[in-house]
């Protein structure tokens, strides 16, 4: 398995995201994001970017593990503080990215984070609607 392309794409993606740049350029035109616990599916580069921007605003203290790479895929495990209460409970998640032709073609999020951006309609300036 050659993980060279997935590593380059994901590194570029998180670099853009971390600098506040337009990470939608890392997505295929028909990209989709699926959050399984709420059944949310968001399609399109701009729509996925906006959804994730709102989602991240509602995920305090995100911590991630080292990224795992495979042929045409990358996997990120992490957790965030539960914003619903002041306990030390954390919400675990795993994101699986599909990668082809130098872009992210799909991403699937496993974990109970759907409530953080429940309807998929996110205004980048204000977070989930």
What is the predicted role of each segment?
Residues 1-129:
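C-terminal and inter-domain tail/linker signature
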